[in-house]
């Protein structure tokens, strides 16, 4: 199980699985739905509520379901995670697509999801086995106005579908289009509590992307995920030490993995614009504008190589050759074999952002 999957627990909670690397006894996953008599979703006679904000997810789990929070020794932080012994149902995006194709759609949302899959599969000429249905449709929690969320697995298939989406969206007329100004304003309002960008900045960034659009009058989002075997990383191959939050300016040198979730941007010529310590006794000693940040024990934060995000919305934000401004969590990465380096993780906290520097 990895990015795009969902699981239901013994407590009736539904989590969405995040990332490709997981501890042997737990799945890193975010709370998405919980039983609630006042909820606006219903499935099999049980009402549920969707939990949107990360802070609310954390509060619910801390107060009511602490078994789903754990401090991970490899990731170095407390993570939302599901003990494998508490998993009762696994929702596989590819299997669910196969089920829908076999039995046919039960409503208009499922019909639109199947039509979009057919459009992308035909236009990109990729195997159907690489496509899946995720989001609310995957777990049977969709409403008549729900979005369609798809996932494309595999690097080659992902790049092919990405190219196909650009052709479809750039066509003067067709079944798939970009959001108009009113629709962009609604998306901006939804994301604004977590990412403090102006509407103009948000609209400019969205215009770069092809993974979000409108199909049959409905919002759609396509996520690109490499197969775990293509990444080749096992739990414990790298250890991560959180150092604090930071804002940096850096030149993007590689954006080949910008379309995927998780996404990655290689960077050079890094300058720290702002820092704030956490989890590190004594905090940071830093001269703003310096390229090296030094801790009280004398160890430097040098060799910051990459900006990464586990959130789909930070994909395709900046491009090779551009200067990026990013705010996120600074981490020291310690491989099992090889020298340590640093990275900035964007999207783990409210207020994180990633955008190109404007003159």
For the regions a language model picked out, list residue spans one by one.
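Catalytic core of pol beta-like nucleotidyltransferases
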Residues: 1-132, 137-145, 153-359
